[in-house]
């Protein structure tokens, strides 16, 4: 049975959304998921980190609304959220105009 779990999709500012994606591990995960949805076991092949840390990064991406999940029995498959790239692209001008100047 396939059960789709909704993304939480917090209302993040442009800078917050880009900060979520800017983490090197999360960036790698987003790139991998953009190429092909995967289960955790396949994602772990691309990021050499402990399973609990991988789960944490996937949770952050899911809560930001950048990743969706679907359940297949005991397995959870991850995919790039349909609007993720559009949201990141739209966040760029906002982040540039609202970022504090050092």
Identify the residue ranges that each predicted region occupies.
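Short, hydrophobic-biased segments on the C-terminal half of alpha helices
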Residues: 58-59
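N-terminal helix-turn-helix DNA-binding core of bacterial DNA-binding proteins
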Residues: 12-50, 72-85
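Residue-level detector of secondary-structure transition/capping positions
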Residues: 37-38, 62, 93
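Amphipathic alpha-helical dimerization/coiled-coil segments
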Residues: 1-13, 31-34, 82-102
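Alpha-helical residues within the helix-turn-helix
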Residues: 45, 62-63
């Amino acid at each position: 049975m396939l059960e789709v779990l909704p993304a939480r999709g917090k209302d993040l500012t442009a800078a917050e959304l880009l900060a979520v994606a800017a983490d090197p591990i999360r960036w790698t995960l987003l790139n991998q998921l953009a190429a092909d949805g995967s289960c955790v076991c396949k994602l772990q092949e691309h990021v050499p980190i402990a399973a609990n840390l991988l789960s944490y990064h996937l949770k952050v991406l899911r809560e930001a609304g950048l990743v969706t999940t679907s359940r297949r029995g005991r397995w959870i498959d991850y995919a790039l959220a349909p609007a993720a790239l559009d949201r990141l692209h739209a966040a760029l001008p906002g982040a540039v105009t609202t970022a504090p100047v050092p």
